């Protein structure tokens, strides 16, 4: 959650955390899905991509290399969907990985 909050990205749903059946109707409103652990949620993300055209990111944001890769994938999806705006998260990546 912190990663997305740091990037000023609003979280639509965290499944299954505190979710209900009624919340599931909001799933297609998301721009993309982040699957931080492939063991949990990957099949759902694949289903949502196939049926609703929602891209997903399955890179686990752990370790310097994978955190940077995950953020770059987020940036790619956000820039593909954002209208009249371009996002660049390289300074955030630098800030998070420089002194590790």
Curated annotation (Swiss-Prot):
It comes from Polytrichum commune. PANTHER family: LIGHT-INDEPENDENT PROTOCHLOROPHYLLIDE REDUCTASE SUBUNIT B. It is found in: Plastid, Chloroplast. Belongs to the ChlB/BchB/BchZ family. It is an enzyme of class 1 (oxidoreductase). Pathway: Porphyrin-containing compound metabolism; chlorophyll biosynthesis (light-independent). GO terms for biological process: light-independent chlorophyll biosynthetic process; photosynthesis. Its cofactor is [4Fe-4S] cluster. Keywords: 4Fe-4S, ATP-binding, Chlorophyll biosynthesis, Chloroplast, Iron, Iron-sulfur, Metal-binding, Nucleotide-binding, Oxidoreductase, Photosynthesis, Plastid. Pfam families: Oxidored_nitro. The gene is chlB. The keyword 4Fe-4S applies. InterPro entries: ChlB/BchB/BchZ, Nase/OxRdtase_comp1. This is Light-independent protochlorophyllide reductase subunit B. The lineage of its organism: Eukaryota, Viridiplantae, Streptophyta, Embryophyta, Bryophyta.
């Amino acid at each position: 959650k912190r990663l997305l909050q740091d990037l000023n990205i609003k979280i639509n749903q965290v499944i299954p955390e505190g979710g209900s059946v009624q919340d599931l109707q909001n799933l297609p409103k998301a721009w993309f899905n982040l699957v931080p652990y492939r063991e949990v949620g990957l099949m759902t993300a694949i289903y949502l991509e196939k049926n609703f055209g929602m891209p997903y990111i399955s890179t686990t944001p752990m370790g310097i290399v994978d955190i940077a890769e995950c953020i770059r994938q987020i940036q790619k999806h956000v820039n593909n969907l954002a209208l009249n705006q371009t996002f660049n998260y390289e300074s955030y990546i630098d800030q998070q990985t420089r002194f590790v």
